[in-house]
C-alpha cells in the first residue's frame, strides 16, 4: 500500500471539497498523511504535524497550483519523494492533472501506471566575505533583490 502525503492549498480548494474527494477516493487504497490542522474534517487519515508530513510518505499529492508545488519541491527532492500535482490554479505547468481527471489519474497512479519526470534543481548561496551565509535549492526560479539602502549588489552566476 502506497504511503501518500496530501497537501492542499486551501485558498484554491475552498471548503477543501476536492481534498475530501481525493481522500475518500484513496481510502482503503493507500495510507494517507495530512496536516493535523485539518483534523476538524474528521477524515479517515493519519493526521500529523505539518513539519512532519513527509516523514512517512513515499509520494506527495498536491492540490493547488504551481506555487503549492514550488513550496515543497526542495524538501521533496532531498527526500526523493515524487510529487503529483492536481491543478486547481489557472495554468498549471507543473500541476499536470486537471481536477476533472483526478480519479482516473489517481487510479493509474495506484496501479503504478506512471513515470516520474525528473526536474533540474538550482542551488543558490548567499555569501558575505566569501563565506556561505545561507544556501538553498529551488525548482523554478530564484529571485535576487537588493537590501533597502544598498545602492549596488554584486552577483556571481555559475552553471555546471
Q: Language model features by range: what are they?
A:
Residues 1-63, 68-78:
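N-terminal glycine-/serine-/threonine-rich phosphate-binding loop
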Residues 80-97:
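Short, acidic/small-residue loops that bind anionic groups at enzyme active sites
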Residues 37, 89, 143:
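Anionic group-transfer/hydrolysis microenvironments
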Residues 93-160:
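Catalytic core of DAGKc-family lipid kinases
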Amino acid at each position: 500500500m502506497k504511503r501518500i502525503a496530501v497537501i492542499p492549498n486551501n485558498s484554491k480548494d475552498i471548503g477543501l471539497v476536492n481534498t475530501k474527494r481525493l481522500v475518500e477516493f484513496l481510502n482503503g487504497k493507500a495510507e494517507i498523511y495530512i496536516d493535523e490542522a485539518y483534523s476538524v474534517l474528521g477524515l479517515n487519515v493519519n493526521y500529523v504535524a505539518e513539519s512532519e508530513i513527509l516523514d512517512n510518505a513515499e509520494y506527495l499529492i498536491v492540490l493547488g497550483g504551481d506555487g503549492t508545488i514550488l513550496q515543497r519541491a526542495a524538501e521533496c527532492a532531498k527526500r526523493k519523494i515524487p510529487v503529483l500535482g492536481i491543478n486547481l490554479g489557472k495554468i498549471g505547468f507543473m500541476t499536470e492533472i486537471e481536477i476533472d481527471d483526478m480519479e482516473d489519474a489517481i487510479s493509474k497512479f495506484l496501479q503504478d501506471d506512471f513515470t516520474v519526470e525528473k526536474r533540474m534543481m538550482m542551488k543558490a548561496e548567499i555569501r558575505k566575505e566569501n563565506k556561505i551565509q545561507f544556501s538553498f535549492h529551488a525548482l523554478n526560479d530564484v529571485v535576487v533583490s537588493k537590501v533597502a539602502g544598498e545602492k549596488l549588489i554584486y552577483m556571481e552566476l555559475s552553471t555546471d
